[in-house]
């Protein structure tokens, strides 16, 4: 189980979801189906937005970035989990664990900031539709998207610098289905106070501040919706915003509960279950909430992606 060299753990063992073999098989089928559907949904959205000129606007530009992010996000955790279900082997090397941790934190932080940017974009579009083209030009949208990715990967690098300097002398059992920061901090034999403080502060900055921006934007959006004169218009706008807000609340609340509260490392079983929400469930529902219910996206998908699929047959006929 452990391979120690000079007092340093060279591999970790991920506990995952220890259950009976029949339930393991059921979980494998469930997560594998979610994984494939998530890949398909997000890939179709990325290609649709890329191929359709009618969607080359800031709103869909951000949606494309979100779907592209989800493609990487779900690949950080689920493939290793699926392999563990099949092989019953949860071992992961030290380097592999740190690599998974880095990309997971980077993509999670990027999503937090990107969701805030998307909420701000919707605020500008709904509360100032006449000024929206000048307030959100494509150049600003590009800079905001780049800032989202840059801040996410930079904050992850800062966390990893502190985590990688800690010593791991054993045990090497991680009570999680992927390499997360809290169980790793619990395994270290070094003084972890500074690393815990950095982790907590960065979690507050990268999760709480974007959440406040989202809440502020949607508060203004709801106030604008209430001023819509027709009940049909209000109902349509509310149904769209409620779906978006539900995803945002689930994602931010679960990440805040896991990372931005003191002594989070002592509730591994709860954290492991909650982690399923923002690592598997939210990426699965995001495309349906943000894009697949959107008439413009569906129409663009029909004309571009489906049209290209049928084009060779039309030529042959």
UniProtKB/Swiss-Prot annotation:
Pfam families recorded: 7tm_4 (PF13853)
Topology within the bilayer: Multi-pass membrane protein
Gene3D superfamilies attached to this UniProt entry: Rhodopsin 7-helix transmembrane proteins
GO-annotated biological processes: detection of chemical stimulus involved in sensory perception of smell
Gene Ontology CC: plasma membrane
Subcellular compartments: Cell membrane
Extracellular topological segments: 1-25, 76-99, 161-197, 259-271
Cytoplasmic membrane side: 47-54, 121-139, 218-237, 293-317
Annotated disulfide bonds: 97-189
Glycosylated residues, chain numbering: 3, 186
Assigned keywords, A-Z: Cell membrane, Disulfide bond, G-protein coupled receptor, Glycoprotein, Membrane, Olfaction, Receptor, Sensory transduction, Transducer, Transmembrane, Transmembrane helix
Xref: InterPro entries: GPCR_Rhodpsn, GPCR_Rhodpsn_7TM, Olfact_rcpt, Olfactory_GPCR1
Membrane-crossing residue ranges in chain numbering: 26-46, 55-75, 100-120, 140-160, 198-217, 238-258, 272-292
GO molecular function, one term: G protein-coupled receptor activity
Role summary: Odorant receptor.
Family membership noted in the UniProt record: Belongs to the G-protein coupled receptor 1 family.
The name this protein goes by in its record: Olfactory receptor 6P1
Organism: Homo sapiens (Human)
